[in-house]
Each structure stands twice: as structure tokens, then as C-alpha cells.
Swiss-Prot record:
Glycosylation sites (chain numbering): N65, N88, N627, N1173
Lineage: Viruses, Riboviria, Orthornavirae, Negarnaviricota, Polyploviricotina
Official protein name in the record: Envelopment polyprotein
Membrane-spanning segments: 208-228, 313-333, 374-394, 461-481, 1392-1412
UniProt keyword terms in alphabetical order: Fusion of virus membrane with host endosomal membrane, Fusion of virus membrane with host membrane, Glycoprotein, Host endoplasmic reticulum, Host Golgi apparatus, Host membrane, Host-virus interaction, Membrane, Signal, Transmembrane, Transmembrane helix, Viral attachment to host cell, Viral penetration into host cytoplasm, Virion, Virus entry into host cell
Signal peptide (residue range): 1-21
């Protein structure tokens, strides 16, 4: 029995060993490549995640030693696209998402792009994008069409949207363009995806409007036929009754009667059996007798109306009219959304600025009406007063400073005048300088102008005195602090802010901190270095007060406070009253809080005065009502004294608060008693302020005040008693001088100097060389030891590429008056001091370093390194994308500061999209060669230079307009036309310009090429869905969780206590209902969406093209200022601008708007996880679970870290009307589909001598036309015309042309025009010009382009077609005529026209015989009857 038991135990042990040694089951995938591992006391969570090229997983094992439990974490990768490295990828940004692992095993999502060469072309006939490469590459199409994939040779992507706004990327090439089909493609896509082939779907959709109106007509007709079989049809009696009545009236009045039946004449039919009254007769004679005898009751219109209600013909007519009526009302609608700002809540610190701003706004609003009403009168009175008073004052001064000499009858100036008996030393001389003729022929007489010189001299004196008075007034502002306050080295009670504030404030708001600082420099109160500190005050009141209170020394605080009070001279002036913007903050604190002493019974008079401003401040009796309470209850004193200090700090920020805190900190609070008393005496009318200050005087006199402990933040605001010192050796700079230009510095020292009076620090200086002849430079960056010499220091990096900036003589002169210290520079330990052998390359290129060209690699962390092995990859890199800096990565190199390099030419700049290139060809032969070379084009646009693209695709509608100007015997001088045109892209209008006598002059086409509202947007962050969560966690066997859980920046922390229990604890932990699991986490997102913020206000830009025959030009005009040139004048008549959104999101090259978080805000909407550069930010409460194991650590499962509402980004509104140019970090967003107003234009035509023109003249004309039939470009024609006379030529062509008349000049030979052909004109076509026939040579390129490519801001053919013919009936008219007649016309040619003319003649003849003949016969009989009556009347006479 014992043996069997022993055998059983051995068997169980062997089985247990076999189980323990069995290979573990691998999660996610088997094997894989180990890419990173780490041993640490905190572990990561297990994950299995896939990116675009691989799958990653993590494995964690635990080990324990004497120091604790450690986690061994490993990360493995399994390739799904094994050969993706062949595309020569780089992390310059792209569409390939790759997850990498940093040194802490955190997942980092990066985007890579391939750099293999790729050729992008477009097949316009098949509407396909073509990609071609030699090795593995990746393409991506985003925008209205989305497609991506890998390929090795050729591939294509079909375009099927009506208008495509797409971004195409292949390899390192990226293009952005706009393309539109000839027709709307939504219908074609719908039908083509069914059983219909493509050409049939295109034909149906080309005539879809006609098909729809026919189907609707048939549907209505069938419905009408059904109701005609019921009595419901008589509901249409009100419709047909008026028609029947009108027909009956015309029947009786207008038609000749048949001699057989008495009814209306009917030449083509027999006499009927029914009379118009409804009676039936067997013979026509009885009917005639019935009509002639007067028994017929007349035409029964209701009978005819009832017949029409039952008639199928009338039903068909009603069906056609109803269908046309219904479809004529189908037009697009446009709406506008207005966003109203949400209410804003202000903090207590902002309240001063808000109240001041609102007070100023209210004051402005209340006084603007008064200012407007007295403005005109005031200006008149001022000028009148100056004129009158100045003249009077100058006249009085002139009389007092001059005398009239009776001896010489002249005026003399009293200045420097002496008497010589009855004469003076100035006799014979007049102040005006005019001399008498010695011969006595010209005698000078005294005039008023003789005193002008004296008046001007006195006027200069008055202006000088006035200027001095103004300067003295401004200078008095500088003395507000008293002379002793500027010389004090420590704060005193008389030199605090409320006591040194200016007593007068007459120029409120007229000064800036900069002007105030310069006034202090002028008054020799401070140096220029002190004055430059005004920038610390900022732009608002709170920023200035924060700058003042943050100073640690009295001199600096006094300086800034003086500047502040000189600018805001009324800050303490309003304390003379019981309200004001500067009192809002401390009064809010006093009202919102309560003193503990006020809870006692009876209530002290002090508490009553806090709520009643009419109480007397002489009956407060603090000692009587408060001593007992504060003596027994120290906590009451501490609370109330703290509240008093809060109020005092809000009321008197700056030096007054600093003085009080300083005395409390020194345990001498009673020394502040005098300061508070002086402040109370200065503002006796401010009752609440006086009460609080007297309360403060009482409180500082109590014994508890000496033991009161200031809060830490208040201790920091108390002034320091000692002057600042600097580390290093104090040195004399008496022999210092500016250093020479150099890039290297030996014996480098950093210099720190302090101004002797205000201790303004100057620490951006350094010296080179030995003592005492220091060479001084401005320290513009960090100092590094050269990487190859320890005694040499470099600027900004370790390569000595940046030159030092010598200090100027003014700075050195100032230094010699300061106390300066020298210290040895410290070698930084930042990224520029860390060498590397390789890195993940983001870009590469050549940069200028002085006169040399350096080969540079830009790493994924934006650091730049010199390299001489650009194509060498580091075999030890994880992803295989690290590039060596030297052969085989043997040499370590240091980063180069970007400021040391210039004119960098990067090879991978193509990650930023390029745009369509436009080429203007000067000759018709070049244009012919360009469009005929091949059908598959690169993305380039070719234009014939004389026409460019300044004409619309469709011939515009012409209007007649009369030229304005001066009409002469030869024609018009200064001819011009004035008109207006809607500011809408694609709008065009033609003008046939006539003279007043009706003479045709010339044709002009005005074309709005682009009318856009645009704005620039800056990229602020990326967002996307969460694909993984990085985490670090640890656990404690016993105890509580740490109060501060360690976490990296932007990581969220989580914790849970009482996690240890039986069966759920690590090995060796015997605990129940205690312990803790804690850690931190951060989301890893796939960046799918970029968010941009508007950087400037919207601008309206309009491009207007004017095309004369043979001359064309375009000009731009904005909405704010007119455009005036020698050829035209443009100005917006009306402006209607729709604001662009403030925030936009771009996903797959599509623009979205809606509820989007701004940078730094994390609301529950799109964009609450934000990636900026390499950091992720977000907010939320992590949710996590853990899995228990016996005698082992727990597995942490992070359910959620950040709140990521990326799903709401998919619900944003796509802005199909907004287009944009993607410039990587910026967007140019524009709307070219909106009517932006009305543009008034005046075209200046110059002189037109049309009366000298002749009708018929001989021309030497040679014409060549190149183009295609029915394509976007039409035919471009070049005309070579030689004429001996100026002429306006009328040309007649057998095709559609954009101009009927051209103006021929003797000085010009080349002309250009555009014509459209619906069929091939052949090699030659006959044109008539000036009455003569000429042959035009044509070259037709066989093209069937389905798609038109442009840059997006210009209008396309389909948009111009929609603008021209946007309603259903217009489309039906065009499509119906083209469907019926175009195939016949192509087959029969001119014979079809002959047939149509004959058919039209037959129809007119039929109408004449059937309708006009009876009416004419009736008219003839009526005329004969009147003739017979006239003859009978004549016989009776």
C-alpha cells in the first residue's frame, strides 16, 4: 500500500512537471520580431494592435528579488506588408500609419510616406487618374473621391463626381486640383451602377430633364384620362367655362356664316347635324332656317366646357402645362446660419478691467450724441475764436512793443531803441524793411503790414511759452511721488501708491506706458534700461497690477507703480467717491464675506457701517465692542484679520500692501498704523473705505497681530530687505570694449550686471579674452564647448557656425556704471549636447553654412545632423528607417542648430501639395502642338496667350449700350461706358457698344473670373480615434494609494483601494481588504483629422476680365477700396459677405464645420483629444478593471483613458460650398459660389473716330484656328490683319462666335478670337469681314474630354451652364431641340433646313385657310353690308 501511494505521488509530480514545461500559448500571433524590452518596477498593459503594415503585441513576465517585484515587458512585431521598406519610406508625413515604441515602451503613432519617384497623369477622355512607378509605391486620393493602395508598376483611379476637389499623393509628389465634368454625374453614377452600360447612362442623364418632364406629363395625362370617366372631371368647369365663352364670342363675331347650314364657315368639312345651341337637325336647310329665324338661343358655352372636361385633347394640354408649371418652381434654396456668442463669466481678477471697459463704453455711448451735435459748432467757434483773439492779442502786444515816431512818421520797435534828442537810432528805418528813395521820389508810408514782423515774432514767443507750459504740466506728473521716494532704498509709509498718486487727472487715457517711461528718462529719474521694463505692465489693468505685486524690491515696484499711476491717473482719484472701476474688486470682497465679530450680540457699530454708508465714523468704539471677543477667541481674530488683509490687498495692490505685509512679517504690524491713517485722511468722503481702514488701525494695534502668520502667497509678496547679488566674481569693466566679429570664443565668461539704483538686471552679455581687456558680446543663445576643442566655446550648438554679436558702445558705457559679476559658463545637457549615430529621417537636403554647402538630415524630432552617407540605413533600427550619419554608423555627430543654416533645399518638400501649372503659349503653332501631342496629359493647363482663359466657356448674352463721351465731327473723344454686374463667379455679359446715332462700334465681353470670400486658417492640432491606450501601473500589498500618483506630463492617473484579498494577491502578500492598484494612462490616436483656426478676417477678392477683340486683360479688386486705372474704374456698389467659420476640420481633404473644440478646450464634442507636435492632451476620468491571479500580480485592463468623442467628428457638416488650398500648416479657405454684391464698372475706351470708317475695304487677312469640336477649349483663332485705315470690322462666320465686331488699327497686326463649333468645320471655312470673303484655316484636334481641370477658384463649364440655364424648362428647351434636330442635322445637313422651311410653309398655309380665310370672308361681307346700307341711305335722300 505504501509503495502504490509513493508511485501515485511520483506520477503526479511527473505530470505536473510536464504541464509546467509545456510551451505557453502565444496570444495575438506566433513568433514575431522582438523590437523592444524593458525591466522596471511598473508594468505596461498587454496589447495586440494592428497598424497599416504590421501587428504589435506585448508580453509581460514578473520576477522578484530582495528589492521588490519587477516586470519584464517585451514588444513584438509581425509584418503584414513585409516589403514595404522597398518604397524608401521616410517620416516626413504621409498616409501610412506605423506604430512605434519609445524607450519607455509607450506606443507612438507616426505617419510615413514613400519617396520612390511617381508620375501622376490624367486621362481626360476616360476621367481617370493614372499612376506609374518603377518599384513598390503607394498612392492616395482624398477629397470628393477617396482611394488608396499599393502598386508596383501602373494603376488608375476613376473620377465620377460632377466636380472633384481632390488631393492626389503618390510617392513624394502631392498635387491638389479641381476638376469638373460637362454634365452632372450623380445621375450617371446611379444608372451606371445598375444594369445600364456607361454610354447609355450618360445619354439618358444628358437629357434627364426632358425625360422627367415627359414622364410627369404622361403621368398627369393618365390621371386626367381616369377622372374624365367620372363626374369628378367637372371640377374643371371653372377652368374651361371662360375659354368656352371666349370661343363662343369670337365664333359669333369673327367668322363668316356657311350659306348651307348657317354655322361658321368650314371649307374642309361637311355641314354638321348639331347647332351651337345644342339642337339636332336632320338637314342643313332646317338648321339654316333655325339660325336665321332667331330660334337659336346662341352659343352654349357650358356645353362646350363640359365637352372639354371629357376631352382627351384638353387633358393632354392641361398635363403639359401642369408639368411645366410644377418643374418651373424647382430652384435651389440657400440658407444662412447665425451663431450667437455664449454668455461669459468673469473671474474676480478680471472685474476691474471689465468694469472699466463697460464704464468707458457706456460713457462713450452717452456722450457720442452730444459730441456729434456740438462738433460742427465747436470747430467753427474754435477757428473763429483763434482768428479773433489771436489778432487782438497780437495787436495789443504790437502796440506795447512799438511806438509811432512823429519825427519820421514811421513805426519803431522799442527793442534796442535809444533816443537822440527828438530822434531815435531807428529813425528812417521801418520794421517791414522797406527803404525810402534817397532822391525822395518814393516816400514810404506807414501801413498795417509794417507790424507783421513784430507780430510774427510775438506769435513765435507765445507758441514757445505755450509749449513750455505744457511740458511743465507734464513734468508736474513726475513729482507726484516726491523727490525722497526716488532716493529711498527701502519702502516707507509716505511712498506707497495711494499717497503718491497724482492729485490732478486731466489727460486720462492720452498716455501710454512707453511715453510715460520716456518722460521719466527725460526727467533723469531712471535710465533707459529701467524704462524698457514698461513692457512688464502688459495691456490690461490686472496684468499691470500683477507685474507690480510680483516685484521683490522696492525700487522696481516703485518704478512700475509710478508708471502705472501716471497712465491711469484716476485709479486712486475715484477713491474720493463711493464708486468707481478700481473699487469694484475690494467692495465685492467686503460685501460677499462677513467678519466673525459681526456675529456677536450686540452688533458693533463697525458692522452696521459696513452695510449703511450713512453711519458716522466717529462712533465706532472698536476697543469697547471688540476687545473682549478678540482676546478670548484668537480664531475670530485670525479670520477677521485675514479678511481685512484680503480687502486691503484688493483696494491698494502694490507698495501699500507690500509695506503692510512687510511690517507683519517683521512682527511690527503697528508701524503700518500711520500709513492707513494717512490714506483714510486723503479720502474722507469714502465712508466704507474709512471704516475699514480705521478697523485695520485697530487690528494692527492688538497683541495678536504681532503673532499673526501670513499666508505663503502673502509672504512671497513682501519686499526683500537686501539688494540682489549674483554668483561669480565681481569684476571691473573699466577696460571692456566691443569684441571683433568671430564664431569662436576663448576663455568665455558670462556677465550679469545690475543697475545701481533700481537693480534692473542685464544678464545677456558675455566676455571673451583675459582680464582686464575683456571683449564684450551679446549672449544671444546657449554656449557649448566645441565638439573638437575643449578651450573653445560656440554659440547655439557645438559646431561654431553662428557668429557672436558684438555689444555696442552704448551698452558698454552703461556697463561701466553698473556692478558686474563674471561666471564660468555651464555646458548644457540638452539635445544639442547629445551625440547620435543615426536617426529616423524625416527629410534630407542641402543647406548653406556660410559659403559652404552641407549635406543635412532632418530627423523625426526635427533635429538636423551633418551626414556623408545619405542612403545608408542603420541595420539596428527597429522599423528599419534609421539613416546613418556616416559610413556604417561609426561616427557620433552632434545636432546643428537650425539658425546656423540657411537656404535649405529639402528633397521631400513634396509632402506639401503642389498646384496645377498654367502655361501661356505665345503663338498659335505652340498651342496647336501642346493640345495635339497626346490625349493623356500631365496636370498642366495650356492657354493661348492672347486670350488666356479670360473668356467664359459659353458665349455670353449681349446687351446694347451707348458710348458716352464728347461727340465730334470725327467720332467720340474720351469714349466710355458705365454699367454694373453681379459679383458672382462665372457671370459674364457682352456689350455691343453703339454711338448715339445707332452706329455699331465694337463688342466687349466682361467676365467675372472669380469672386471669392476667403480667409487664412492656421493648423492648431490633430485628432482621431483611439487605437490603443499607453499605461503604467503598480500595486501595493497593503496600505492606501499614494496621495500623488507619479505620472508623465499629460497622462491621467487612476487608482483603486482594497484590492488585496484571498486569491487576489501577489506571492508573499497575505492581506485582506487592503492594498492598492494605481497607475497612469494616455490615449494613442490615429491622426485622421486636422483642425484649423481662422487667422484673419474674411476678404472679398474679385477678378474681372475684360476682353476686346485682339486685346484682353484681368484685374483684381477688393471690397474695401475702388480700382482706378487708365482702362477702367471698378468699385463695389453693394457688398454681401457671409462669414466663414472660426474653426474647421479637414478629413480626407474634405472640409467640415460644427461643434469643434478649440486648442486647450476639451468639451464633449469633436476634438477633445488633441495632438500637437508629439504630445497628446485631453481630459477625462480613466475607467479600468483588473484580473486577479493567485500568488501573482494583477492584469490591468484600461477601458477608457481620455474622453474621446471622435465619433462626433463624423457628424460634422461637410461644407461642399467651401473650397480650400492645403498648404500643410495653413489653409486658404474660400467660397466662390456666393453672390458677394454688385460691381459697378466704367470702361474707358479712348477716342473712337468711327465717322472716318468705311463699310467695305480691302484687307490683307490670314487666319489660323486650332481647337476641337464641342470641347471645353473650343477654337482659338489667330488673325493677321494688315490695314491702311483704322476700321471697325463686322465679320460674319458660319459658327457661334464671341465677338461680332473688332476694331482694326493700322498700328496693330495680331488679333485673336474664340469661336465654338458643334461640328467639324473642315480644313477651311469662309468668313465675311468688311463685306469681303476670306478663308480661315482650321486644325481640329480629335478630343472627347469628359473632364475639365482647373485650380478651383475659377468657374467651370458645368457651373457656367447651370448659371446660364438653371431651370428645368430651359434645360428641356435645350435638350429637346438638340435631341430632335441634332442627329437629323448631322445626317441631312442643309437639306434638313430646306425640308423645315417647306414644312413651315405648309403649316402656315393650313392656318391661313382654316382660320384666317373665314375671318377675312366675314370682314368682306361686313364691308359689303355697310356699302349697301350707304347706297340705300343715299337713295332716300
Amino acid at each position: 500500500m505504501a509503495i502504490s501511494t509513493s508511485l501515485l505521488i511520483v506520477a503526479l509530480l511527473i505530470k505536473l512537471c510536464l504541464v509546467n514545461t509545456a510551451p505557453p500559448i502565444s496570444k495575438c500571433f506566433q513568433d514575431g520580431i522582438l523590437i523592444a524590452e524593458l525591466k522596471s518596477s511598473s508594468g505596461i498593459s498587454e496589447f495586440c494592435i494592428k497598424d497599416d503594415i504590421s501587428i504589435l503585441k506585448s508580453e509581460i513576465t514578473y520576477s522578484k528579488n530582495d528589492t521588490g517585484i519587477f516586470m519584464h515587458s517585451k514588444v513584438f512585431r509581425h509584418w503584414t506588408v513585409a516589403d514595404w521598406k522597398q518604397c524608401n519610406h521616410t517620416s516626413a508625413g504621409g498616409s501610412t500609419n506605423v506604430l512605434e515604441v519609445d524607450k519607455n515602451l509607450n506606443l507612438v503613432a507616426k505617419n510615413y510616406m514613400c519617396t520612390r519617384p511617381c508620375v501622376i497623369t490624367i486621362d481626360k477622355e476616360n476621367a481617370q487618374l493614372l499612376f506609374q512607378t518603377e518599384q513598390l509605391n503607394q498612392f492616395e486620393v482624398t477629397g470628393t473621391t477617396i482611394s488608396t493602395g499599393w502598386f508596383k508598376s501602373k494603376t488608375s483611379v476613376s473620377l465620377d463626381n460632377t466636380c472633384e476637389h481632390i488631393k492626389v499623393t503618390c510617392g513624394k509628389k502631392s498635387l491638389q486640383f479641381h476638376a469638373c465634368f460637362k454634365q452632372h454625374m450623380s445621375c450617371v453614377r446611379f444608372l451606371h451602377r445598375s444594369v445600364l452600360p456607361g454610354y447609355m447612362a450618360s445619354s439618358i442623364c444628358q437629357n434627364i430633364e426632358l425625360i422627367i418632364i415627359i414622364i410627369l406629363t404622361l403621368a398627369i395625362f393618365i390621371f386626367m384620362c381616369i377622372i374624365t370617366r367620372t363626374y369628378i372631371c367637372y371640377l374643371m368647369l371653372p377652368l374651361f367655362a371662360p375659354i368656352a365663352y371666349l370661343y363662343g364670342w369670337l365664333y359669333n363675331r369673327s367668322c363668316k356664316k356657311c350659306i348651307c347650314c348657317g354655322l361658321a364657315y368650314h371649307p374642309f368639312t361637311n355641314c354638321g347635324s348639331y347647332c351651337v345651341c345644342g339642337s339636332r337637325f336632320e338637314t342643313s336647310d332646317r338648321m339654316r332656317l333655325h339660325r336665321e329665324s332667331g330660334l337659336c338661343q346662341g352659343f352654349k358655352s357650358l356645353r362646350v366646357a363640359r365637352s372639354l372636361c371629357k376631352s382627351k385633347g384638353s387633358s393632354l394640354v392641361i398635363s403639359i402645362l401642369t408639368a411645366m408649371l410644377i418643374l418651373s418652381f424647382i430652384t435651389p434654396l440657400e440658407a444662412m446660419t447665425t451663431n450667437y456668442p455664449d454668455d461669459k463669466k468673469f473671474t474676480l481678477k478680471e472685474v476691474n478691467d471689465i468694469v472699466l471697459g463697460r464704464d468707458m463704453e457706456q460713457e462713450l455711448k452717452s456722450s457720442i450724441l452730444i459730441l456729434m451735435s456740438i462738433c460742427g459748432i465747436g470747430i467753427i467757434l474754435i477757428f473763429f475764436g483763434l482768428t479773433v483773439l489771436l489778432e487782438i492779442v497780437l495787436e495789443l502786444i504790437a502796440k506795447r512793443s512799438t511806438i509811432f515816431c512823429k519825427e519820421c512818421n514811421l513805426i519803431h520797435d522799442k527793442k534796442s531803441m535809444t533816443y537822440r534828442g527828438d530822434f531815435t537810432n531807428k529813425c528812417g528805418f521801418c520794421p517791414c524793411g522797406e527803404l525810402e528813395d534817397p532822391e525822395g521820389l518814393v516816400i514810404h508810408t506807414t501801413r498795417k503790414s509794417c507790424t507783421y514782423y513784430i507780430k510774427i515774432r510775438n506769435l513765435k514767443l507765445i507758441m514757445l511759452i505755450f509749449s513750455i507750459v505744457i511740458l511743465m504740466q507734464n513734468a508736474t506728473m513726475l513729482v507726484v511721488a516726491g523727490e525722497n521716494c526716488w532716493t529711498n532704498t527701502e519702502i516707507k509709509a509716505d511712498c506707497v501708491g495711494p499717497l503718491i498718486g497724482p492729485s490732478a487727472c486731466t489727460n486720462k487715457g492720452s498716455k501710454t506706458y512707453k511715453t510715460v517711461a520716456q518722460e521719466l528718462v527725460t526727467a533723469s529719474k531712471i535710465t533707459q534700461l529701467d524704462a524698457d521694463k514698461y513692457v512688464l505692465l502688459g495691456d490690461t489693468i490686472e496684468s499691470a497690477l500683477d507685474a507690480i505685486t510680483s516685484q521683490k524690491h522696492y525700487s522696481a515696484m516703485h518704478l512700475l507703480e509710478t508708471m502705472f499711476l501716471m497712465k491711469h491717473c484716476d485709479y486712486y482719484k475715484v477713491y474720493e467717491h463711493n464708486s468707481g472701476y478700481s473699487q469694484t474688486k475690494w467692495r465685492l470682497i467686503a460685501i460677499a464675506n462677513s467678519f466673525d465679530i459681526c456675529t456677536n450680540t450686540p452688533t458693533p457699530n463697525f458692522c452696521k457701517c459696513l452695510s449703511d454708508s450713512s453711519c458716522s465714523t466717529t462712533t465706532l468704539n472698536f476697543a469697547t465692542s471688540m476687545n473682549a471677543t478678540y482676546t478670548s477667541k484668537v480664531e475670530f481674530f485670525n479670520h477677521d484679520f485675514t479678511l481685512f488683509l484680503d480687502i486691503f490687498e484688493a483696494a491698494f495692490p502694490g507698495s501699500a500692501t507690500a509695506f503692510l505685509f512687510k511690517k507683519i512679517k517683521e512682527k511690527n504690524p503697528y508701524q503700518a498704523f500711520e500709513m492707513m491713517g494717512k490714506i483714510a485722511n486723503k479720502y474722507p468722503n469714502n465712508k466704507l473705505l474709512v471704516v475699514i481702514l480705521k478697523y485695520g488701525q485697530y487690528m494692527v494695534g492688538l497683541s495678536h497681530a504681532s503673532t499673526y502668520q501670513l499666508k505663503q502667497e502673502w509672504v512671497a509678496k513682501s519686499l526683500s530687505l537686501t539688494r540682489a547679488q549674483r554668483t561669480g566674481l565681481k569684476m571691473s569693466m573699466a577696460n571692456a570694449e566691443p569684441g571683433p566679429a568671430t564664431k569662436e570664443c576663448s576663455d568665455a565668461k558670462t556677465i550679469a550686471c545690475l543697475t545701481p539704483k533700481f537693480q534692473v538686471e542685464v544678464n545677456n552679455l558675455m566676455s571673451c579674452g583675459a582680464s582686464p581687456n575683456f571683449k564684450i558680446y551679446v549672449k544671444t543663445g546657449e554656449l557649448y564647448k566645441a565638439h573638437d576643442r575643449n578651450s573653445v566655446w560656440c554659440l547655439n550648438d557645438m559646431h561654431c557656425l553662428t557668429p557672436y554679436t558684438p555689444a555696442n558702445a552704448e551698452i558698454i558705457t552703461t556697463m561701466k556704471k553698473m556692478d558686474c559679476w563674471q561666471d564660468n559658463p555651464k555646458q548644457p545637457t540638452d539635445e544639442y549636447a547629445i551625440p547620435k549615430r543615426s536617426c529616423q529621417m524625416k527629410d534630407r537636403g542641402l543647406c548653406n553654412s556660410g559659403a559652404d554647402k552641407w549635406k543635412i538630415i532632418k530627423c523625426d524630432n526635427h533635429k538636423l545632423f551633418y551626414t556623408d552617407a545619405l542612403e545608408r540605413r542603420d541595420p539596428a533600427s527597429i522599423v528599419g528607417s534609421n539613416h546613418c550619419f556616416s559610413e556604417k554608423c561609426q561616427i557620433e555627430r552632434y545636432p546643428i542648430n537650425p539658425t546656423s543654416l540657411t537656404n535649405c533645399e529639402w528633397l521631400y518638400r513634396a509632402v506639401r501639395p503642389e498646384y496645377i501649372k498654367k502655361l501661356s503659349l505665345q503663338t498659335i503653332e505652340e498651342y496647336k502642338k501642346a493640345i495635339a501631342d497626346k490625349l493623356t496629359h500631365t496636370l498642366q493647363l495650356y492657354h493661348f496667350a492672347p486670350l488666356l482663359e479670360n473668356l467664359p466657356h459659353i458665349k455670353p448674352t449681349y446687351k446694347y449700350i451707348t458710348a458716352q463721351g464728347t461727340y465730334t465731327a470725327d467720332g467720340i473723344e474720351g469714349a466710355s461706358i458705365t454699367t454694373s454686374i453681379p459679383a458672382l463667379s462665372g457671370t459674364s455679359v457682352g456689350f455691343k457698344i453703339n454711338a448715339k446715332d445707332g452706329t455699331d462700334l465694337l463688342d466687349i465681353v466682361v467676365y467675372i473670373k472669380a469672386s471669392v470670400v476667403k480667409s487664412i486658417y492656421n493648423h492648431i492640432y490633430d485628432t482621431g480615434p483611439t487605437i490603443n491606450i499607453n499605461s503604467k501601473h503598480d500595486e501595493l500589498c497593503t496600505g492606501q494609494c499614494p496621495k500623488k500618483i507619479p505620472a508623465d506630463p499629460n497622462w491621467l492617473t487612476f487608482s483603486q483601494e482594497r484590492t488585496s484579498r484571498w486569491g487576489c494577491e501577489e506571492f508573499g502578500c497575505l492581506a485582506i481588504n487592503t492594498g492598492c492598484v494605481y497607475g497612469s494612462c494616455q490615449d494613442v490616436i490615429r491622426t485622421e483629422t486636422k483642425v484649423y483656426r481662422k487667422a484673419n478676417e474674411e476678404t472679398v477678392m474679385l477678378t474681372v476680365c475684360i476682353t476686346y477683340p485682339g486685346h484682353t486683360f484681368c484685374t483684381d479688386v477688393n471690397a474695401h477700396e475702388p480700382k482706378i486705372t487708365d482702362e477702367l474704374e471698378l468699385q463695389f456698389k453693394t457688398i454681401d459677405i457671409k462669414s466663414l467659420p472660426n474653426l474647421v476640420a479637414v478629413t480626407n481633404h474634405k472640409l467640415y464645420t460644427g461643434q469643434i473644440n478649440d486648442l486647450g478646450t476639451f468639451g464633449q464634442m469633436c476634438g477633445n483629444v488633441q495632438k500637437t507636435n508629439t504630445s497628446h492632451t485631453g481630459a477625462g476620468t480613466p475607467k479600468f478593471d483588473y484580473t486577479c491571479y493567485s500568488a501573482s500580480r494583477k492584469d490591468i485592463i484600461i477601458r477608457r483613458c481620455y474622453n474621446n468623442n471622435y465619433d462626433s467628428c463624423r457628424l460634422l457638416n461637410q461644407e461642399s460650398d467651401l473650397l480650400f488650398d492645403d498648404n500643410h500648416e495653413t489653409l486658404v479657405v474660400y467660397n466662390n459660389k456666393r453672390l458677394n454684391g454688385e460691381l459697378a464698372l466704367k470702361l474707358l475706351l479712348g477716342d473712337i473716330q468711327y465717322k472716318l470708317y468705311t463699310e467695305n475695304m480691302e484687307l490683307e487677312l490670314e487666319a489660323k484656328c486650332v481647337g476641337c469640336v464641342g470641347c471645353f477649349e473650343s477654337y482659338q483663332c489667330n488673325l493677321q490683319i494688315t490695314s491702311s485705315l483704322d476700321e471697325t470690322a463686322l465679320y460674319l462666320v458660319p459658327v457661334s462666335h464671341f465677338h461680332d465686331r473688332i476694331q482694326i488699327k493700322t498700328t496693330k497686326k495680331d488679333y485673336a478670337m474664340k469661336i465654338s463649333c458643334t461640328r467639324d468645320p473642315g480644313d477651311k471655312a469662309s468668313f465675311r469681314v468688311c463685306g469681303k470673303s476670306y478663308d480661315f484655316n482650321f486644325h481640329t484636334v480629335p478630343k472627347n474630354d469628359k473632364i475639365e481641370v482647373n485650380v478651383g477658384d475659377e468657374t467651370s463649364y458645368i457651373k457656367e451652364k447651370d448659371n446660364r440655364c438653371g431651370r428645368w424648362l430651359c434645360r428641356v428647351r435645350d435638350e429637346g431641340l438638340s435631341v430632335i434636330f441634332e442627329p437629323l442635322n448631322n445626317f441631312f445637313g442643309n437639306y434638313l433646313n430646306m425640308f423645315l422651311y417647306i414644312l413651315g410653309g405648309i403649316i402656315l398655309l393650313f392656318l391661313a385657310l382654316y382660320i384666317l380665310m373665314p375671318m377675312c370672308a366675314r370682314l368682306r361681307d361686313e364691308l359689303k353690308r355697310n356699302e349697301r346700307l350707304h347706297q340705300m341711305e343715299m337713295k332716300k335722300r
